[in-house]
Amino acid sequence: MEIERINEDTIKFYISYLDLEERGFNQEDVWYDREKSEELFWDMMDELKYEEEFSPEGPLWIQVQALKHGLEVFVTKATIGGKGEDGFDVTLSSPDELAEEKIEKLLEENFNPVKKESLGEDDTLEFILEFRDFEDLISLSRATGLENLVTKLYSYQGKYYLNVEFPENKYDESNIDNAVSILLEYGLESNLTGYMLAEYGKVIFDVPALKQVRKYF
């Protein structure tokens, strides 16, 4: 498992599916077994105590993302209390029964994948593309077949990131695969999430970003 300090308040975990198996878990356990996913979370937090000077006390925001070869988990100290749209506040300073119930609810909400049939007409799927050279982004803006994408451009730590959303009412699985293939001709799939970019990145072009890049460059 890899642990990366994003900033003073945020830690990123990356655990490969192979590492999961070596720890006695499998993907089915993590997605569908509440006790197993809770056990994995606490294992990660225990390991954090030895790897990083990060005190998991007070409310936390936790976001889980499934990648091709593993899981990415962001743990951020919240500046305010209360439940928000993208996380769940958890107090770990005293592991009493109430905290355990919050953890169970958090893990059930974040580790269980959304079933496609539960998505509404206006729901979207998200993809983050990383560019090391702005010229690649300019070239992408002129590509065909991407007109219905919802795009937003950020800069973060010296790189450019394009947050791409595929509206469910305009993209089926086949169309998404085709669009992603085009996107990957110009950039790299990023491990960052839209939440992280919105929180810590700088907006260069709001929606529709690709259209604006094409217009000005």
From Swiss-Prot:
Q: Which Pfam family, any one of them, does this sequence belong to?
A: MecA
Gene Ontology molecular function terms on file: protein-macromolecule adaptor activity
Give the InterPro entries listed for this entry.
Answer: MecA_C_sf, Neg-reg_MecA
User: What function does this protein fulfil?
Assistant: Enables the recognition and targeting of unfolded and aggregated proteins to the ClpC protease or to other proteins involved in proteolysis.
Q: Which family does it belong to?
A: Belongs to the MecA family.
Q: What is known of its domains?
A: The N-terminal domain probably binds unfolded/aggregated proteins; the C-terminal domain interacts with ClpC.
> Which HAMAP family does the UniProt record give?
MecA
Summarize subunit and interaction data from the UniProt record for this chain: Homodimer.
Q: What is this protein called?
A: Adapter protein MecA
Organism of this sequence: Listeria innocua serovar 6a (strain ATCC BAA-680 / CLIP 11262)
